[in-house]
Amino acid sequence: MAIRDWPEDARPREKLLKQGAAALTDAELVAVFLRTGVAGKSAVDLGRDLIERFGGLGALCRADRVAACRAPGVGEAKYALLQAVMEMARRTLAEDMQAGDALSSPAAVRDYLRLILRDKEYEVFCCVFLNAQNRVIAVEELFRGTLTQTSVYPREIVKRALAHNAAAMILAHNHPSGVNEPSQADRSLTRRLAEALALVDIRVLDHFIIAGASALSFAEAGHL
């Protein structure tokens, strides 16, 4: 049965408008995004199939172009729309992070870093530069590496921090392996960076390791 023939309260779009997006199941959310189904399947059925195909809603949203466009009911236009939605989410989180104090709203910083780093297939080292009020000046990806490591040069980080006239920084890198435990090299690097930046009166407030959906804080774990 086509969705248009369902009772009004059961139709995903009408349900969203009346009860809010949080009231929808994952399959119903995907159905609203898709708008239409395929032969023999409603948009909700198709949404359910796509979630199962990719292993979850998050995995569907993060699927690459080739994999997404091979899936029934998606195609280039839907993939482009999905990428636009994801980029809107990233920019919204960036605005939230930049609007607040990084110390009083650490969740916004953590969520943003998790969003930009979690799906990288190689190690990336990022720096969040903060002013004297702990507000975000800039976020920069400074180094890229391989699946298991990246080379980080303290001198370059100090140069960028001085260029931004930063008073403090938050460091972040990802572990594509999915293991968020800091290695001895991670701890040693954090210590060296904190010492190098302290020489120019710049504080390192935290260092996050992003591993899949998890984010480990050096400050919270007592490593900083």
UniProtKB/Swiss-Prot annotation:
Cross-referenced Pfam families: RadC (PF04002), UPF0758_N (PF20582)
InterPro entries per UniProt: MPN (IPR037518), RadC_JAB (IPR025657), RuvA_2-like (IPR010994), UPF0758 (IPR001405), UPF0758_CS (IPR020891), UPF0758_N (IPR046778)
Sequence motif JAMM motif, residues: 173-186
Domain of life: Bacteria
Binding site for Zn(2+): 173, 175, 186
GO BP terms in the entry: proteolysis
Membrane-spanning ranges: none
Record-linked PANTHER family: DNA REPAIR PROTEIN RADC, UPF0758 PROTEIN YEES-RELATED
NCBIfam families: PRK00024.1 (NF000642), radc (TIGR00608)
Family membership noted in the UniProt record: Belongs to the UPF0758 family.
Name of the featured protein: UPF0758 protein Tbd_2588
Annotated organism of origin: Thiobacillus denitrificans (strain ATCC 25259 / T1)
Phylogenetic lineage: Bacteria, Pseudomonadati, Pseudomonadota, Betaproteobacteria, Nitrosomonadales
